[in-house]
Amino acid sequence: MAAAVKVVQEAPLPAALDSKMHKVSIIVQLAKFEALKKALNNIGVTGMTVTQVMGCGLQKGSGEKYRGAEVDATLLPKVKVEVVVSKIPVEKIIDTATKALYTGHIGDGKIFVYNVAKVVKVRTGEQDYNALQDVE
């Protein structure tokens, strides 16, 4: 099995391509989801998409317990939380999620940040920044 490729340098997004809207995907253990949801709500995140997923990372192949039983650690149940933000700084989302999830052990989770090119609120036709605002 080949070793993971180590990232040596972050490639900055050219300013012309940065829409100021970002999707943050957070992969988290089931047991940590409620703490993450509460922490995100406390900083003003009002909407999120939550999906139950299966995945593995560095803990692959190690013994894991799920609901008290030893399970095959090839794929473990996780939760993927996705938020799209424009008003709340991405770094605040990352910092909040990291503090809510950190245990110092393998399996604490991963955070992925993507630039969002376009958002359309279907009901109103609002686009981009306006589509992300919670006003009626």
Question: Could you say what each language-model-derived stretch is?
Answer:
Residues 1-136:
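Positively charged, small/polar-rich N-terminal and surface patches that mediate targeting and assembly
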